[in-house]
């Protein structure tokens, strides 16, 4: 059996794996246990009452968190003409068409989000094998294929998170940094849950938001009591 590190022993002693914590208590506990030498992210896992094997029950989308994620986001935009100028004005680091595609083919991937106008998809389509595995392929379902690239850039910069359930019907994303005020983390979580409720598939039956857990980058998961979350009400 692997030997527990001091950090893991502290987490094991502090976190009751059988308990659902009030949201404020959960955040306080996460902050107390976040002792890494960097500012850890606060991540959320939301178990949804869906059958992930059925395509019509998969949940995918994006939402802007009211207090952002605390991350600095670099944006690449495939577009041309007036849209290119608008994207630059909105703060995009990289803007182009074939020239940008060539950079990416050479392995130059210094960006976190890729946005494209519809007319640019003929170029972006050639990059599927490069962007797809990294989760960077633009998609209209998450607002990254759009005629209004400037707005999409602003959303990305403002702290937009994209979400997509995994094969077990669980959404994994981030809601901020551990040094955020507790109220800001709670409001970000509420905003995400509201977005997930709006994205509920019509064919999903029963309890939709089954479980909500929070964790930090290096910490253990803490289950959250949904009765303290207005947005989680089914």
Curated annotation (Swiss-Prot):
Name the keywords, alphabetized.
Repressor, Ribonucleoprotein, Ribosomal protein, RNA-binding, rRNA-binding, Translation regulation, tRNA-binding
Name its species: Cronobacter sakazakii (strain ATCC BAA-894) (Enterobacter sakazakii)
Summary of the function given for this chain in its UniProt record: Binds directly to 23S rRNA. The L1 stalk is quite mobile in the ribosome, and is involved in E site tRNA release. Protein L1 is also a translational repressor protein, it controls the translation of the L11 operon by binding to its mRNA.
- Kindly give the InterPro entries that the UniProt entry links to this protein: Ribosom_uL1_bac-type, Ribosomal_uL1, Ribosomal_uL1-like, Ribosomal_uL1/biogenesis, Ribosomal_uL1_3-a/b-sand, Ribosomal_uL1_CS
Q: Where does it sit, as one GO cellular component term?
A: cytosolic large ribosomal subunit
Q: What is the lineage of its organism?
A: Bacteria, Pseudomonadati, Pseudomonadota, Gammaproteobacteria, Enterobacterales
Q: Does the keyword tRNA-binding apply?
A: yes
Q: Which PROSITE patterns match?
A: RIBOSOMAL_L1 (PS01199)
A Gene Ontology biological process noted in the UniProt record is: translation
Q: What is this protein called?
A: Large ribosomal subunit protein uL1
Outline the subunit composition: Part of the 50S ribosomal subunit.
Give one GO term, molecular function aspect: structural constituent of ribosome
